[in-house]
Curated annotation (Swiss-Prot):
Residues 25-101 form a coiled coil. It is found in: Secreted. This is Olfactomedin-like protein 3. Residues 1-21 form the signal peptide. Abundant in placenta, moderate in liver and heart, whereas fairly weak in other tissues examined. On term placenta, mainly localized extracellularly surrounding the syncytiotrophoblastic cells and very rarely expressed in the maternal decidua layer. It comes from the Eukaryota. Belongs to the OLFML3 family. Keywords: Coiled coil, Developmental protein, Disulfide bond, Glycoprotein, Secreted, Signal. Glycans are attached at N177, N248. Its main location: secreted. Pfam families: OLF. The keyword Signal applies.
Length: 406
């Protein structure tokens, strides 16, 4: 052992005392922290026990209430089923009574109309229409309906092109607008975010009402002539028909409709002044004028030139009419009430004279209380595309020969 060893031992002994003191304080600190944690843990256990007891008490109180609510729900469901059955039975009885006591048809037999000299630009008036196809069907009944979705405002139009080779859906929202939505197929239209996937076609002039028509790749619509704002309940001016090419997005033709003092043809659809329609025979227009403000007029149009080929004064009243469509040369007018009830075809006019009054069926639409802003007939599908307060609906039609008895 060298001479420096005692000095090293003395040095280590001098440091051992303070280190032992520090260890003692550290142990005391750890004991205090553990005691605090144990106290908090005990508090948490007490709170958990108290909360568990409160939850048990709440559950015991709620179980009887839930049993009572379940019994009341079952009672309400039973009552609703009973009421639904009674309503169905009443509707069947009403339908039976209506078939036993049908409303008087408004079909005009063409032996009563007489021909007159033609007027240039207006076409022949009240002459029997010569069918260009062998279409001889009439509506037997409106069999079913399917509500597709709700899109847009209370008034609008949706349709397919009856002559088109695609399944495109055209949607024209509103009564004074200039943009149409085009969907590739019906499935795309029914999607939740359908508007994002639709292409938009903007026309150079805003349309008037819900009388537009897509036919043969063209959009036909009515507009107010420039410089003639019109307005009010009656239009002092006539309307201009526009033929718009949907693919090229250009106006290819236009023509002033040969009728002055136009008024809405439908008493329940005040924004439409000319309602364009298409069937197996071609292009038609439904309108009314102040000259006879009680009844509808029908015109046959040339889809190429927009010329009016023939015109008829129909016996179908404007009052309570809401929409119309044409099938095989026969005009069918749909009537309703305000507030809305079940719509019904209550007037027909066969321009060819084939459908006689006693053979005209006047069916109700399926059980739905609404108001049709527009109806478009598709000859290929034998379906109606309807706009009902923002809902897009498809009606399937059952047909029969015009010569068959009802």
């Amino acid at each position: 052992m060298g001479p420096s060893t005692p000095l090293l031992i003395l040095f280590l002994l001098s440091w051992s005392g303070p280190l032992q003191g520090q260890q003692h304080h550290l142990v005391e600190y750890m004991e205090r922290r553990l005691a605090a944690l144990e106290e908090r843990l005990a508090q948490c256990q007490d709170q958990s026990s108290r909360h568990a007891a409160e939850l048990r008490d709440f559950k015991n109180k709620m179980l009887p209430l839930l049993e009572v609510a379940e019994k009341e729900r079952e009672a309400l469901r039973t009552e609703a089923d009973t009421i639904s059955g009674r309503v169905d039975r009443l509707e069947r009885e009403v339908d039976y009574l209506e078939t036993q006591n049908p409303a008087l048809p408004c079909v005009e037999f063409d032996e009563k109309v007489t021909g007159g000299p033609g007027t240039k630009g207006k076409g022949r008036r009240n002459e029997k229409y010569d069918m260009v196809t062998d279409c001889g069907y009439t509506i037997s009944q409106v069999r079913s309906m399917k509500i597709l979705k709700r899109f847009g405002g209370p008034a609008g139009l949706w349709t397919k092109d009856p002559l088109g080779q695609t399944e495109k859906i055209y949607v024209l929202d509103g009564t004074q607008n200039d943009t149409a939505f085009v969907f590739p197929r019906l499935r795309d239209f029914t999607l939740a975010m359908a508007a994002r996937k639709a292409s938009r076609v903007r026309v150079p002039f805003p349309w008037v009402g819900t009388g537009q028509l897509v036919y043969g790749g063209f959009l036909y619509f009515a507009r107010r002539p420039p410089g003639r704002p019109g307005g009010g309940g009656e239009m002092e001016n006539t309307l201009q028909l526009i033929k718009f090419h949907l693919a090229n997005r250009t106006v290819v033709d236009s023509s002033v409709f040969p009728a002055e003092g136009l008024i809405p043809p439908y008493g329940l659809t005040a924004d439409t002044y000319i309602d364009l329609a298409a069937d197996e025979e071609g292009l038609w227009a439904v309108y009314a004028t102040r000259e006879d403000d009680r009844h509808l007029c029908l015109a046959k149009l040339d889809p190429q030139t927009l010329d009016t080929e023939q015109q008829w004064d129909t016996p179908c009243p404007r009052e309570n009419a809401e929409a119309a469509f044409v099938i095989c040369g026969t005009l069918y007018v749909v009537y309703n009430t305000r507030p809305a009830s079940r719509a019904r075809i209550q007037c027909s006019f066969d321009a060819s004279g084939t459908l006689t009054p006693e053979r005209a069926a006047l069916p109700y639409f399926p059980r739905r209380y609404g108001a049709h802003a527009s109806l478009r007939y598709n000859p290929r599908e034998r379906q109606l595309y309807a706009w009902d307060d923002g809902y897009q609906i498809v009606y399937k039609l059952e047909m029969r020969k015009k010569e068959e008895e009802v």
